[in-house]
Amino acid sequence: VKETGVKYHVCHISTKESVALIRKARAEGLDVTCETAPHYLTMNDSMLQEDGRFKMNPPIRSEEDREALIAGILDGTIGMIATDHAPHSAEEKSRGLEKSLMGVVGLETAFPILYTKLVKTGVLSLEKLIELMHTNPRNRFCVGTPLEEGQPASLTVYDLDKEYTINPDDFLSMGRATPFAGEKVFGACRLTMYHGSIAWKDETL
C-alpha cells in the first residue's frame, strides 16, 4: 500500500493481531479500511459446538480477540460490519464441525444480533451501528444512493421493540446454518424496499 498508494480493504478480520496491524497502518496515513462480522463480535471459541453451523472462515476466535474487535470498532480502526453471508445446503452443513463446508448465513440475523447484543447492552449506539452496517460501506465503495425525497428508496424497516426467537426455518435464504439459532433477539424485519419497490414485507402485520 505504501509503494502503490492503492486503496486497501481487508475482509472478515477476526484477531487482535489484525486489529493492531490495521490500526498502525491507518495511523501512518495509509488508505486502509476493514470489516468484521457479527459472529466475531458476539461469540468466542468457548461457545463452539460439534455442529456445521459453527464452522466459518476465519473461525470463531478467543474472547481476547473478540474484545480487541470491539475496541477496534470503538476507536474507528474497524469501520464496517458485513454479514459474511455464505449459504450452503443442509447436507453440506450436516457433516459436523470438521467436515462441513465453511460458511454460515448472515442476512437474516446480522442486524437483530448486533442490535440486541451491542446496542441494547450499551456497547454501541444505534446511530453507530447504522454507520458501520450502511453508511461507511456505501461511502467506501460508492454503492447505493442516499435516502432523499423524490428518489427511489432502498431501505429496511425494523421493529426495534419486537422480541422473537431466531428460527432458521423462517429464513428466505437457501442456507439455514447459523450459530444464532434459538437466540432471543430484538429487531424484527418488517419491510424491505429496493429502488422504490417493495421486495418483501411481513404479511402478519
Region roles according to the model:
Residues 2-5, 74-81, 86-158:
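His/Asp/Glu-enriched, well-ordered alpha-helical/loop segment
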Residues 8, 35, 84, 114, ...:
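Residue-level signal for inorganic ion chemistry
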